[in-house]
Amino acid sequence: ISEGLLSLDDKLVDMFPEHCPEDPSDNLKEVTVKDLLTMTCGHSTDPTYASRTNTEVSWIRLFMEHPFTHKPGTLYCYNSLGTYVLSAMVQKVTDQKLVDYLFPRLFRPLGINNVSWAESPEGVNTGGWGLFLKTEDLAKMGLMILQKGQFNGCQVVPAEWIESASSAQVPCVPAGMNSDDADK
């Protein structure tokens, strides 16, 4: 996003018209990069399991066919498949797999030299799972986040992005409660 290749307002249906259902819902038509990043795309259930057990259909298509029961941006629902779709977006606009795109921008500046990421049957890094690295390398990522995007005096990730990524985006169930507790 900071390089201008994607914007928070880019729409999913514009990025992948070839995977769009024949008659997309109004909610699907409104899903943006921001909605995917904040896991507020409008799904009320996580469609990830269906993708991991189905190697015959595009995972992007499975994501887009899953019911968008809420207006995007209004309901938080943990959604690993949404992060996969973000990975596919990065691959589409950069012509690089996410792991390759991030290597010079994130991993190398953190001193992480041995990293791999699981892929879908379509050859897209999974995004929300399957990142393989050493424990101490994961700790470097945590330290960078604690230091507002800096590592060894270098600004690796914009501080504004760290602030936004670690701030509440939509009202949700208080920490430590599940949705059933919130109704009591």
List each language-model region with its residue ranges.
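Active-site helix/loop module of the DD-peptidase/beta-lactamase fold
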Residues: 3-41, 65, 94-129, 133
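Generic alpha-helical structural context detector
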Residues: 34-38, 61, 108, 140-143, ...
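Active-site SXXK
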Residues: 1-9, 36, 86-90, 138-144
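Active-site cradle of extracellular carbohydrate-active enzymes
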Residues: 40, 48-57, 61-119
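Penicillin-binding protein/beta-lactamase superfamily catalytic region
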Residues: 76, 100, 115-184
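Surface-exposed patches in mature extracellular/periplasmic domains of secreted proteins
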Residues: 7-9, 48-50, 152-154
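Aromatic- and histidine-enriched alpha-helix N-cap/loop-to-helix transition segments
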Residues: 28-31, 76-84, 132-136
